[in-house]
């Protein structure tokens, strides 16, 4: 009888090994898919990319979440905004960050009603869902916190928290808790 108990125990151990192997295999497959997706994002995301008017539609409609900065090269506030957007682009790979010289994209500046620079237009699945004009939402000052910009983009629903790098500017929980207020 003790030999049967020993054999039954060994059979259960082998069953556990099979289950662990299946779980391990599934996890490895999941990690490979995540790595492949991250590499895909890195090839098209992760930077503030300047585009021209003829690439605008392709870039905006080809990704779920897009932030487009309409700028003028001589405006200091546009340069300030660029620096913050470059940092956010490196941390939120699931959101594409683009910039367009407004002088060279008159068709889209007209269609989107852009009259003040800088202007950020937020796109979700190719549709303009929101915009941020100038620095008014940041207290009208040049030294706004990058967290304020991240919260603003998040409120538009286009800041992807699922596909991020190790660098952390802000978390989804910070946005929910409104952790970074304008008067901080």
From Swiss-Prot:
This is Phosducin-like protein 3. Residues 45-184 are annotated as: Thioredoxin fold. Coiled coil: none annotated. It comes from Dictyostelium discoideum. SUPFAM superfamilies: Thioredoxin-like (SSF52833). Pfam families: Thioredoxin. One of its GO terms (cellular component) is cytoplasm. PANTHER family: THIOREDOXIN DOMAIN-CONTAINING PROTEIN 9 (PTHR21148). Belongs to the phosducin family. It comes from the Eukaryota.
